[in-house]
Amino acid sequence: GCEWDSWC
């Protein structure tokens, strides 16, 4: 998710 990665 946006909390640990940048795929959101």
Swiss-Prot record:
Question: Where, per the database record, does this protein carry Cysteine amide?
Answer: 8
TM regions (residue ranges): none
Cystine pairs annotated here are 2-8
Say yes or no: keyword Disulfide bond present.
yes
Gene Ontology molecular function: ion channel regulator activity; toxin activity
Key words, A-Z: Amidation, Disulfide bond, Ion channel impairing toxin, Secreted, Toxin
A single cellular component GO annotation: extracellular region
Task: State the compartments where it is located.
Answer: Secreted
Tissue expression pattern: Expressed by the venom duct.
What this protein is reported to do is described as:
Its target is unknown, but this toxin may modulate voltage-activated calcium channels (Cav) or calcium-dependent potassium channels (KCa).
Q: Which family does it belong to?
A: Belongs to the O2 superfamily. Contryphan family.
Domains: entry comment: The cysteine framework is C-C.
Q: Quote the protein name from its UniProt record.
A: Contryphan Li981
